[in-house]
Amino acid sequence: MVSIHICAEWCHLFLNGAVYDVPKAICFGDDKAAARILATEDVAEIKALGRLVSGYDESLWNGVRQIVVYEGLLAKFSQNSGLSEQLKGTGQAFLAECAVKDRIWGIGLSMHDPNRLDRAKWQGQNLLGYALMMVRERL
């Protein structure tokens, strides 16, 4: 396994989601997949390539992915004072990613679902919300 370090130069990858899938490919030694992901800006293609990473081990990735996203978000918000101020402006609010189809990074509920306000009724893990709150605390 290759060690992963998200450097500040990778912030542009957030524009297309590759900040998640490139380290995933690198983590499992799939340099070809990493290169193919970097060669495209098509979000759907990036996601598809990320699903095809050779040697992928879900148990291992589940332990690494939160660190990858946290480091990427920290770099992104540290380099952009406007974004940083917006995030800090949320104060102590509990942040949630309202995404019906995403039960890992989101809460599995839409922005219009009244259950979004009740954490006991969330259908997802909200890993993105937790990562954003960690970054906010660090800033």
What is the predicted role of each segment?
Residues 1-139:
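Charged, low-complexity intrinsically disordered segments
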